[in-house]
UniProtKB/Swiss-Prot annotation:
Organism: Danio rerio (Zebrafish)
The entry's DNA-binding region: 201-260
Compositional bias segments (type: Low complexity): 86-98, 121-136
Function text: Sequence-specific transcription factor which is part of a developmental regulatory system that provides cells with specific positional identities on the anterior-posterior axis.
GO cellular component: nucleus
Name of this chain's protein: Homeobox protein Hox-B5b
Region span, Disordered: 63-182
Amino acid sequence: MSSYFLNSFSGRYPNGSDYQLLNYGTNGAMNASYRDSTSMHSGSFGYNYNGIDLSVNRPNNGHFGAVGDNSRAFQNPSQETRYRQSSCSLSSPDPLSCATSDTLELKGSSPPSDQSTPTGNSRLTNSNNLTSSNSTHFADTDETNVSSETEEGAQTTTTSHTQKQESVATSTTTPNDGQTPQIFPWMRKLHISHDMTGPDGKRARTAYTRYQTLELEKEFHFNRYLTRRRRIEIAHALCLSERQIKIWFQNRRMKWKKDNKLKSMSLATAGSAFQN
């Protein structure tokens, strides 16, 4: 089975010595194969691996004769120190340790992939900063929108509350106005029936001022009967109601008739006495 596998491998890959296989022979060969196997899979460790150089001449001593010696042809001595750090725990005969390999790596020139990582990290940090700033900007705009919406809602609620209070105030003041109306002279309604009932249920006597009586007497001297228009004008001028003006003129005419009747009666008696 092993011979068939080896023959098939050599048939497929003419440069068999160029492709390294794990050799479980002696200790030195095993260590060499483990150390050199990293050169084939160096891409998995993040190093710069340019591929296998197939231009090397095929040796005459079989396919798997000297694996450790042929493997040295594919790598530079400067790269050996870097590749050896990945298998430092496996290579027992070498005195190199992880600490020394780390110091060598720090002192040596970093590969292009290592050099590209800071720039990539800086780009990532810049993109993260941009996204965070955008997110904060959007959060600020959302907060301002929310704050503006809450302020508008509060203003609408306050306006509605004030309107409700005004409506309640008007509804409460209307019955009070109906009970005790406060009517100014220029707002006085002329056909308001004022409550003039006294304590005994009778109509209270209207007390006119001297100025009102004088003005009414002057008007009665010129006109014993008033038209509706003139009555309204006098009522507004004297701060009285139309009904009060009408009643005063009725009473004044009755008094005037009574005085004239007495005067005519006295004249009649005087004339009859003179005739006799």
